[in-house]
């Protein structure tokens, strides 16, 4: 069991399974996964052992609500959103890398020097709402984002930034995000970069990836790297020359698979990636360029748009990595119609995935593996390789 004083003192209960031995956590998650797939014929599928995570220090990102005063800021959570006195400082949270606590101390000093008055939710006054800190495991470089209510403090931030960069030489990307609304929203639409660099380089399995401020990126890099490597391994021996990566994010799945397939078959592989986030598409396109993948087309679109494009060449493989709601009945039926030979389904919600697999009536599961992306909680990711059923 992790030694966490916040949990022991009942200050933070985000890690709801902290008292459950890790081996039991994995067993319960595996049982839950099998229950979600009970209506699917998995008799001939290969069930691989769960991919384990480190139990602590596994997160690469900290999302810290800022409260307290400008002289004594508190970085962490509010147990009661309407009560500033309920603030809990989580700078020593054992889920973060050890050096984050030192960085937080430096950032508290910066908050005072720049006069960033913490936003008071009850009074609807103040400026600084959140601090978001992300680390690249490949380089050790950092991305720092200040979520502010207005632009009023930008001149002071710019004035103090050179001193902060001296204290934190690994700080590669710094930005201000404007979120003017009095609402439980983490970030707004406008991002103001304060450094020349606008993305944080990462590298999984020799695939360059780029973390952008408003793009989604997994928070458990060790398990994410294992997830991508497994996907790459599963498809690398299959006869695939044209693949779609739907909900592609920064391109992790598609780039891993396309690179392995191109090396395997010695010919260009066609990759089409679809993602609604334009910043993620920029990152994915940059990665493809570095890898020298020529027949790649990443587009900033809703994944459902592929249903309307009847002229697109039909793929051999479709990768889907949807949000928690799953891919839904309409997209499932579309995949049944175009019948790619294989579907690779990555899910963060086994319940909706189970429903989607019921709709994918033309497919049978070949391989299934759980990835423990979120230890100390009931959440997990799962990867399933599906093959088109043979017509008798």
UniProtKB/Swiss-Prot annotation:
Q: What class of enzyme is it?
A: transferase
Q: Give me the residues that bind S-adenosyl-L-methionine, please.
A: 218, 247, 275, 321
Per the UniProt record, which EC number(s) apply here? 2.1.1.189
Q: What reactions does this protein catalyze?
A: uridine(747) in 23S rRNA + S-adenosyl-L-methionine = 5-methyluridine(747) in 23S rRNA + S-adenosyl-L-homocysteine + H(+)
Top-level taxon? Bacteria
Q: Per its record, what are the GO molecular function terms?
A: 4 iron, 4 sulfur cluster binding; iron ion binding; rRNA (uridine-C5-)-methyltransferase activity
An example GO BP is: rRNA base methylation
What CDD domains does the entry give? AdoMet_MTases
Q: Where is the active site?
A: 348
Q: Keywords for this entry?
A: 4Fe-4S, Iron, Iron-sulfur, Metal-binding, Methyltransferase, rRNA processing, S-adenosyl-L-methionine, Transferase
The protein's matches in Pfam families, at most eight in alphabetical order, are given as:
tRNA_U5-meth_tr
Positions of [4Fe-4S] cluster binding:
4, 12, 15, 93
- Job of this protein: Catalyzes the formation of 5-methyl-uridine at position 747 (m5U747) in 23S rRNA.
Identify its protein family: Belongs to the class I-like SAM-binding methyltransferase superfamily. RNA M5U methyltransferase family. RlmC subfamily.
Output the NCBIfam families linked to this UniProt entry.
Answer: meth_trns_rumB
The protein depicted here goes by the name: 23S rRNA (uracil(747)-C(5))-methyltransferase RlmC
Please tell me the species this chain comes from. Answer: Haemophilus influenzae (strain 86-028NP)
Give the classification, highest ranks. Bacteria, Pseudomonadati, Pseudomonadota, Gammaproteobacteria, Pasteurellales
Q: Please state the gene responsible for encoding this protein.
A: rlmC
């Amino acid at each position: 069991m992790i030694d966490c004083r916040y949990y022991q003192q009942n200050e933070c209960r985000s890690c709801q399974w902290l008292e459950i031995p890790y081996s039991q956590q994995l067993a319960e998650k595996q049982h839950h996964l099998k229950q979600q797939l009970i209506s699917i014929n998995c008799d001939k599928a290969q069930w691989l052992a769960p991919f384990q995570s480190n139990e602590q220090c596994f997160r690469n990102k900290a999302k810290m609500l800022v409260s307290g005063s400008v002289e004594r800021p508190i970085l962490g959570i509010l147990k009661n959103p309407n009560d500033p006195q309920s603030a809990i400082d989580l700078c020593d949270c054992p889920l973060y890398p050890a050096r984050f606590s030192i960085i937080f101390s430096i950032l508290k000093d910066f908050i005072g020097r720049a006069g960033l008055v913490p936003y008071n939710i009850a009074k609807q006054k103040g400026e600084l709402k959140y601090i978001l800190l992300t680390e690249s495991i490949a380089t050790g470089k950092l991305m720092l984002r200040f979520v502010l209510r207005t632009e009023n403090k930008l001149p002071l931030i710019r004035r103090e930034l050179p001193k902060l960069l001296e204290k934190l030489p690994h700080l590669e990307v710094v930005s201000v995000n404007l979120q003017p609304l009095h609402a439980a929203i983490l970030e707004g639409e406008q991002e103001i970069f304060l450094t020349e660099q606008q993305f944080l380089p990462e590298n999984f399995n020799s695939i360059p990836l780029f973390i952008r401020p408003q793009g989604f990126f997994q928070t458990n890099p060790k398990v994410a790297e294992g997830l991508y490597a497994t996907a790459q391994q599963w498809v690398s021996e299959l006869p695939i020359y044209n693949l779609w990566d739907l909900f592609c994010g920064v391109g992790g799945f598609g780039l891993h698979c396309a690179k392995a397939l191109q090396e395997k078959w010695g010919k260009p592989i066609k990759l089409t990636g679809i993602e609604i986030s334009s910043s993620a598409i920029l990152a994915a396109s940059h990665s493809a360029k570095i890898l020298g993948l020529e027949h790649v087309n990443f587009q900033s679109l809703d994944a459902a748009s592929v249903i309307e494009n009847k002229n697109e060449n039909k793929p051999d493989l479709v990768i889907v990595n949807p949000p928690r709601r799953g891919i839904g009945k309409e997209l499932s039926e579309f995949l049944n119609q175009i019948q790619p030979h294989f579907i690779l389904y990555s899910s963060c919600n086994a319940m909706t995935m189970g429903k989607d697999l019921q709709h994918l009536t033309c497919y049978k599961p070949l391989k299934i593996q759980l990835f423990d992306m979120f230890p100390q909680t009931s959440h997990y990711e799962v990867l399933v390789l599906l093959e088109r059923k043979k017509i008798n």
